[in-house]
């Protein structure tokens, strides 16, 4: 038990109780506004954060004054007579959508401070490892290609959202022990929920909050997901055949500043959970070939074990969410499939095992015989239907894939329109360069190219065919030249580019740190 307690010991280095006073500083909101205009650290578009020209220093000062005026509420939030705090006046600062957006973004900046690599390195007197900048999303696929070829079963897991925001606040208490800040967060979420309860049902409340306060919800959600992974790491470590002293796990942590390699448990309460719900079944998880990969809310669990073993892991996930996080999750939502007959969607690719059979003739003296061999290969394909659906959502084409103009871009200059469409094509080529077959990607590029021509034609009141003839190869170079130049440096000169590099060669890049926007829309 002492060893387990040491494994689950809290990390005190990140519990800095100095964040709440920063909520009353103007530069915090200026920083949040600047992040919103330029996109987040992960290069998200401006419209994600909902910032516009209405933000100003005067409004920030007015917000801080109102927070001061409402500050006396924080000391009595837990009072039994809560009805007196429920005001339905739209002018209340917590009910104002604009002010709540500012508070949400300012709070998101504050809670991210303890996880800044610069701050952590300052307190720990360590330099920031340069390898953190080299971790690419594409690095997951060579790992899958190396490991999945020898496994039997795979399970798609969609990590559910908690049904109540209070669960997320309780989890955050173990990461940041700034009591006033946590009280303010609880107060803010309570008021936000009461205001939206008149407009939406309680079941959709957390969904609406995640859409309107993406940055704050993303941090709270990642704290919750990390709890699931901490317990998963503990179970996997307990069930491992080899108890190495240097045993460690690497979990790809998206939307976190720090991607932790050697994890420590954050809650001593996990001891009780493990003892009460998992102690009697740990013996059944003796499987050295278990692999877990997650990005955002989608996880893949693969194993070389039996179907019964995968079912036991499945029900332990369900028990974890039911008994530890206190919300019901139906077991049928976790699908277990035989890897040889299944294609799973992960990180914008459809991945499956492709069996390649070959026959070798063996000659020994006067005798000869044939040897049939079967090898597995991980095939990664571009999900054309999903991408067309994403293009339809952002109005580049119809649901059936017919290109249309982009009216919202018609007011831009011609060069800006071409540059935007070209950048989208280059980003798609860059992200889906690991596809086994490129024909589907070429179809998406064709849709974008025609959409670009029709957007220009709409601006100049002409036809798309006219602009295609006018621009000719110039438009084609804007969409394809960069990819061709990159591949020409990598592939052998003797092999024709149009056949070998375009259709067969898979290339994984080491500089992709975020999922393509079209993949996120699908």
Curated annotation (Swiss-Prot):
Pfam families, alphabetized? Intron_maturas2, MatK_N
Which cysteines pair up through disulfides? They are: none
Q: What GO cellular component is one of the record's annotations?
A: chloroplast
The main place the protein resides is plastid
Q: Where are the transmembrane segments?
A: none
One biological-process term from Gene Ontology? RNA splicing
Q: Which InterPro entries match?
A: Domain_X, Maturase_MatK, Maturase_MatK_N
Keywords, A to Z, come to: Chloroplast, mRNA processing, Plastid, RNA-binding, tRNA processing
- In the record, what terms sit under GO molecular function? RNA binding
Where is it localised?
Plastid, Chloroplast
Q: What does this protein do?
A: Usually encoded in the trnK tRNA gene intron. Probably assists in splicing its own and other chloroplast group II introns.
Q: Which HAMAP family match?
A: MatK
Family membership: Belongs to the intron maturase 2 family. MatK subfamily.
Per its UniProt record, what PANTHER family does this chain match? MATURASE K
What is the protein name given in its UniProt record? Maturase K
Which classification does the entry list for the species?
Eukaryota, Viridiplantae, Streptophyta, Embryophyta, Tracheophyta
């Amino acid at each position: 038990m002492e060893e387990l307690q040491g494994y689950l010991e809290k990390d005190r280095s990140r519990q800095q109780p100095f964040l709440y006073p920063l909520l009353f500083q103007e530069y915090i909101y200026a920083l949040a506004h600047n992040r919103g205009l330029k996109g987040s650290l992960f290069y998200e578009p401006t419209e994600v954060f909902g910032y516009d020209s209405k933000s100003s220093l005067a409004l920030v000062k007015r917000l801080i004054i109102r927070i001061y005026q409402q500050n006396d509420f924080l000391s009595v939030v837990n009072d039994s007579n809560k009805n007196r705090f429920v005001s339905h006046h739209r002018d209340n600062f917590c009910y104002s959508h604009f002010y709540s957006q500012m508070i949400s973004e300012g709070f998101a900046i504050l809670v991210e401070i303890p996880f800044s690599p610069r701050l952590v390195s300052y307190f720990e007197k360590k330099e920031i490892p340069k390898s953190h900048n080299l971790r690419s999303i594409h690095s997951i696929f060579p790992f899958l290609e190396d490991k999945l070829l020898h496994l039997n079963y795979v399970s798609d897991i969609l990590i559910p959202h908690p049904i109540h925001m209070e669960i997320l606040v309780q989890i955050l208490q173990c990461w940041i022990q700034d009591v006033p800040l946590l009280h303010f967060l609880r107060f803010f979420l309570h008021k936000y929920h009461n205001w939206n309860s008149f407009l939406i049902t309680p079941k959709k409340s957390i969904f609406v909050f995640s859409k309107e306060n993406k940055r704050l919800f993303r941090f709270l959600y990642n704290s919750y997901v990390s709890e699931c992974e901490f317990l998963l790491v503990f179970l996997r470590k307990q069930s491992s055949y080899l108890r190495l002293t240097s045993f460690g796990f690497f979990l790809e942590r998206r939307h976190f500043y720090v991607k932790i390699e050697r994890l420590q448990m954050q809650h001593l309460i996990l001891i009780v959970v493990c003892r009460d719900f998992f102690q009697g079944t740990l013996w059944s998880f003796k499987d050295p070939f278990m692999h877990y990969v997650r990005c955002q809310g989608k996880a893949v669990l693969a194993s070389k074990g039996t179907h019964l073993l995968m079912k036991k892991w499945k029900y332990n996930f369900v028990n974890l969410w039911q008994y530890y996080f206190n919300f019901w999750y139906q077991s049928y939502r976790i699908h277990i499939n035989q890897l040889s007959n299944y294609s799973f969607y992960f990180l914008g690719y459809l991945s499956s095992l492709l069996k390649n059979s070959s026959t070798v003739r063996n000659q020994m003296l006067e005798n000869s015989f044939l040897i049939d061999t079967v090898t597995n290969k991980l095939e990664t394909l571009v999900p054309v239907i999903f991408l067309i659906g994403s293009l339809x959502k952002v109005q580049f084409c119809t649901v059936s894939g017919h290109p249309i103009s982009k009216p919202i871009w018609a007011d831009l200059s011609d060069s800006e329109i071409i540059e935007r469409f070209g950048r989208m094509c280059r980003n798609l080529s860059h992200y889906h360069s690991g596809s086994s077959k490129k024909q589907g990607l070429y179809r998406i590029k064709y849709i974008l190219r025609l959409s670009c021509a029709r957007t220009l034609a709409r601006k100049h009141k002409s036809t798309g065919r006219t602009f295609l003839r006018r621009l000719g190869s110039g438009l084609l170079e804007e969409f394809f030249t960069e990819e061709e130049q990159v591949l020409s440096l990598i592939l052998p000169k003797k092999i024709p580019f149009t056949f070998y590099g375009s259709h067969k060669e898979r290339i994984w890049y080491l500089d992709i740190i975020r999922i393509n926007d079209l993949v996120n829309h699908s």
